[in-house]
């Protein structure tokens, strides 16, 4: 339940961040869309955990499929990239989301993939919010990666 609440809060934070920015090139259709990238493993060692986070994100999106910004309604669409629970493959997944032009990113389950993908989001100036990446290095030196969970030192010493 706590993880679901964290994911819901994460989605609210993303929507709030999006409200602060402007879309330079709106879609050519009448429907305005905000695309949120989901940077989660659906395969590999952390695939099961990533799938649970995806379910939480999808649930939050089903509850809040639109957001009103400046009096205009925007549809929130999700697009996915499987980082395969592998820090050597996470940069490719991050680049996929950047190339899709996402407005913000949610994820990932597993700190090593967040650390590996984070520089790509930072370079593209895309805010990313991790719900379970607890390693302090995820956000250190990256002004675009945030987290809604505690960090490893808070959990206790080894």
Task: Give names to the regions the model predicted.
Residues 26, 54-80:
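Signal peptide-proximal N-terminal region
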Residues 1-35, 66-70, 99:
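Short, low-complexity disordered leader/linker segments with a strong preference
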Residues 102-158:
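Extracytoplasmic ligand/sensor domains, especially the bilobed periplasmic-binding protein
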Residues 74-99, 155-158:
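Structural motif
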């Amino acid at each position: 339940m706590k993880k679901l609440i964290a994911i819901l809060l994460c989605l609210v934070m993303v929507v709030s961040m999006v409200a602060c920015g402007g879309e330079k090139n709106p879609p050519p259709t009448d429907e305005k869309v905000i695309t949120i990238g989901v940077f989660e493993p659906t395969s590999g060692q952390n695939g099961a955990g990533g799938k649970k986070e995806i379910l939480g994100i999808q649930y939050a999106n089903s509850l809040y499929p639109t957001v009103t910004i400046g009096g205009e309604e925007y549809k929130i669409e999700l697009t996915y990239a499987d980082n395969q629970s592998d820090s050597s493959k996470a940069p490719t997944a991050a680049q996929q989301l950047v190339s899709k032009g996402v407005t913000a990113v949610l994820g990932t389950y597993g700190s090593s993939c967040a650390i590996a993908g984070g520089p790509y989001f930072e370079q593209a100036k895309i805010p990313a919010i991790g719900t379970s990446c607890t390693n302090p290095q995820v956000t250190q030196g990256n002004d675009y990666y945030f987290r809604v969970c505690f960090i490893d030192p808070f959990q206790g010493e080894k």
